[in-house]
A protein has these predicted regions:
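Conserved acidic donor-binding segment of nucleotide-sugar-dependent glycosyltransferases
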Residues: 138-145, 153-158
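Conserved catalytic-core segment of nucleotide-activated headgroup transferases in glycan assembly
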Residues: 1, 6-92
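Acidic donor-binding loop of glycosyltransferase active sites
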Residues: 91-105, 116-119
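A short, well-ordered alpha-helix in the C-terminal region of glycosyltransferases
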Residues: 153, 160-174, 181-187
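Short acidic/histidine- and often glycine-rich active-site loop of Leloir-type glycosyltransferases
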Residues: 124-140
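Short glycine/proline-enriched, acidic/aromatic patches that form the donor-sugar handling elements
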Residues: 67-69, 86-87, 104-107, 126-131
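Short hydrophobic beta-strand element within catalytic cores of glycosyltransferases
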Residues: 109-112, 119-123
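C-terminal alpha-helical cap of glycosyltransferases
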Residues: 178-199
Length: 199
């Protein structure tokens, strides 16, 4: 078995170079699970959490943003829409939110954000196939209360959040870096070849 691989990011992760009072979601907004998850997050989580997190802004980015989400913009919710550069946008923001309630397959955007050292709050569905550990590499929330508590944790204890992001980066580099996966593939092929032809 060879996992999905991502390119190594040669990016200096400097403390304090991003908007510390921000959280964000980025993804294709013509994909039904993204629409459902973000709508749920806005209606059930953010509608309560933003009162407890004054000064924190939620940024929603992604192509084909539906009118139902465009209408949600307010002083603590910035509906950005499509952005040119996922990496640059992510590096400018703090906590990544991935509130997936449905869908299958590995979440490439989560792996890419982890490789940037981002702290991510997602659901059990969002982390499927990745193998990251809750509270160490990522924060997993499957209820409204858990999402709110993890948001409050990240903004009240930025050093803890930063540590989770750094652990996420190390985890992805160890398990999903393309050059390491290719090296493992070569090793496996050599082992097969060394056994000779199948009689």
């Amino acid at each position: 078995y060879l996992p999905f691989g991502i390119e190594e990011k040669n990016i200096e992760l400097l403390k304090g170079t991003f908007d510390q009072n921000s959280c964000y979601h980025i993804g294709s907004m013509d994909w039904a699970p993204n629409i459902e998850g973000v709508q749920w997050f806005l209606d059930e989580v953010w509608s309560k959490a933003f009162h407890e997190l004054p000064g924190i802004t939620l940024y929603l980015a992604g192509k084909n943003m539906p009118p139902s989400l465009l209408s949600k913009e307010n002083k603590q919710t910035d509906v950005v829409g499509e952005v040119d550069d996922f990496v640059q946008f992510s590096l400018e923001k703090n906590i990544m939110i991935v509130p997936l309630l449905a869908g299958a397959g590995i979440r490439v955007k989560i792996l890419e954000a982890m490789s940037l050292g981002k702290t991510i709050i997602t659901t059990s569905i969002g982390v499927e196939g990745i193998g990251a550990t809750d509270g160490i590499h990522i924060l997993i929330s499957d209820t409204v209360d858990s999402f709110i508590q993890n948001l409050k944790l990240c903004f009240s204890n930025p050093e803890k959040a930063r540590q989770i992001g750094l652990e996420a980066k190390t985890f992805v580099e160890s398990n999903f870096q393309k050059k390491k996966i290719y090296a493992e593939m070569v090793t496996q092929l050599k082992q097969i070849a060394s056994k000779g032809p199948i009689e």
